[in-house]
Amino acid sequence: MSNINQQARDVFLNLFILEMANNHWGRLDRALKIVRDHGAVARHNNVRAAIKLQFRDVDHFIHSAFKGSTNHRYIEKTEATRLTRADYARIVKEIVAVGCVPMATPFDEASVDLCVELDMRILKVASSDANDWPLLERIASTRRAVIVSTGGTSEKDLDDLVTFFENRNIPLAINHCIAIYPSDDGELELNQIDYFKQRYPGHVIGFSTHEYRDWQASMYISYAKGARTWERHIDIDHEGVAVSPYCSLPEQIDQWFKAFHKAREMCGGTQDARRVLPRREIEYLDALVRGVYAKRDLEPGYVLSGQSFKDDLYLAIPLQRGQLSCREVMNGERLVKAIVADQPLTVDHIDGPYSESRTLRDLIFNRGYAPSDDEA
């Protein structure tokens, strides 16, 4: 991730997107409860979360000849779940109040203007709109950070979209998405995360999921593969309103967040540099390293070499305090002090950096076995 610019990191890195969609069912009170319940879970798990709304200019989004249609589920649900601008403003205020980031998917140009009016920090391009160029142009004109979902989108269309936002220097994250509602485990295609990382190396890659059987396994896998933003639909079990199987309840989102923390713990630090080695690990391995012992009595002036080492010295456990190990013995080192058979070869026996440097000397004397260890 070292080639992703700092602005994109600040916006997208380890961001969870909680998609409310139309699960408010046109009721402000239900929308506010969704925000509060899921916001509390995000706060309790110490994660950065955006709660995402969907905006449509219903008066113009639906063709006049089809308004009121009950034969088209998308049209019927859009009309049935309509909220006012004032309602949306109140929801956004609540999103901020619970410590989450306000975010929206605009499905038409007028809705982009509403995003600006309500100061939505991040805009989302739905999979269905990845090549809706009038909409993309309007979204880009806001100069706001953008996340795009890629379900059902061709490679050519994705390349064009990514180039479009790159040319305008607009922060863009790319979500691997399977637009199947709900998705089974065998449909998740998580190897696509690797594909997106390789094809679009300058962007944060995410995973937008509609699975419904598990809230942990795909988090472990997607995090390990390098996804750094995630999205799920959210809802609440309240007042008998049916919950779609691809939507997650607060207790399931809690599992999801905890899986993130576990994945992060298990994967460790940066992938761009060697990890910092914990002292406990080093001390454990030092106890397994062989120390150098004399096969016979040796006098001062004796010079270590590859052949003489085989003839006159041997390696065995335990490595004792102050003793040189198989790691430190080098050709040309000279004994400055006599050593008897089966005695450990220590820092005090030879010349060289480990006897001359206080820091290196302390390193040798602070590791390995000491008789006092048996008393501890």
Regions found by a protein language model. Give the residues of each.
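Catalytic cores and adjacent flexible loops of soluble metabolic enzymes
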Residues: 1-376
